């Protein structure tokens, strides 16, 4: 308890602890430091792949694994669902680990904690896995009514473009954060 005592005094704006001590014990041919760096590299690669797939949403010639669903009901006009269906893929020279709860949680937490404010396009973001045996995630986002994208008469293409831009920005920021984590893990 005393060893972990320091983390109880480090809280974020939501009163959640953000100070943790992790001990990585390698059961692998890589040592603990190499495993830590490799895990962060996997997250960066996954964020980059997700960002590339987001860009395919705007390209009508490409078939995208991400779809946006808008509601026609007047009371739900400001709500949009994003369905992400990106399963793991193993090829000869590369492995895509798939879009998973780790990636969804990282994106949701970053947008909620760092990108949503009184003037931002989004007012709310949350996600859930549709079924434990499916690689399908449903993000629910709400537009800020004080933002111009929150108006009921804004077209879907403009909203989709703005959402892709917001999500790409989140991926870029997270890539930078994980890059810094790798540098600190390598002692640079």
For the regions a protein language model found, what residue spans apply to each?
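Protein-protein interaction/assembly regions in multi-subunit complexes
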Residues: 1-188
